[in-house]
């Protein structure tokens, strides 16, 4: 709708209450280029929003994390569970969200408190192991059995595991009939200490969008799907 787009580009401040958010719209770049600020209020239960209201201290924490990420040549993710993932960060687009927008031409979402990088093409390789208790935001549930991603040049080339979680993941991704559904979208980590690990158990799936889990302090974030910076 050209008239709607024109109105948005002429607005100084936009409050986004849509289900998925303007951040996933192809028109967003044009809107931000006009100097408009977009404040996305994530589709979360009101109690989540009240617990994770904007925190002034988060801004410096997130900005510091973004700075460190941008200065790094690579990211290596390892743990005793078997994960060994290497990510090339050279010339990677990295952004941080602290929960509000205070600069023209920027977009933020509430809740905030995370940093994410969008790796360039052929930048992600290794093994990512999900164990019981890890969080699967695709299905808004906790893993109950082991799932292993084998990743080569950004793409999940094999999914290992004998439990329900592996079966669901294989079936879900196969349903897209699209190789890029298996490609790395972004990686990052959470920085919001107010986020609660057990929050997924407290709400119906329709009552949350999972932003709290993405911002969970200390949690590593790995996402597959679209990545415009890698041409996908």
Question: What is each of the regions a protein language model found here?
Answer:
Residues 1-144, 148, 152, 178:
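Active-site bordering "gate/hinge" segments
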């Amino acid at each position: 709708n050209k008239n709607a787009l024109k109105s948005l580009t002429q607005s100084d401040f936009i409050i986004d209450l849509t289900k998925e958010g303007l951040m996933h719209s192809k028109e967003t770049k044009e809107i931000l280029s006009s100097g408009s600020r977009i404040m996305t209020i994530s589709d979360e239960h009101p109690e989540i929003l009240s617990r994770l209201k904007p925190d002034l201290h988060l801004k410096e924490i997130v900005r510091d994390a973004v700075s460190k990420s941008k200065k790094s040549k690579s990211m290596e993710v390892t743990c005793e569970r078997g994960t060994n993932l290497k990510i090339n960060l050279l010339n990677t687009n990295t952004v941080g969200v602290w929960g509000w927008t205070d600069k023209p031409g920027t977009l933020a979402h509430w809740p905030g408190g995370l940093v994410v990088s969008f790796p360039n093409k052929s930048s992600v390789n290794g093994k990512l192991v999900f164990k019981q208790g890890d969080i699967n935001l695709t299905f808004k549930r906790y893993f109950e059995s082991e799932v292993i991603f084998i990743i080569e040049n950004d793409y999940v080339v094999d999914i290992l595991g004998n439990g329900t979680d592996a079966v669901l993941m294989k079936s879900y991704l196969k349903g897209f009939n699209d190789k890029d559904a298996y490609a790395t979208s972004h990686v990052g980590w959470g920085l919001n200490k107010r986020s609660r690990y057990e929050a997924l158990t407290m709400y119906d799936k329709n009552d949350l969008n999972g932003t709290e889990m993405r911002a969970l302090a200390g949690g590593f974030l790995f996402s597959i799907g679209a990545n415009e910076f890698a041409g996908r």
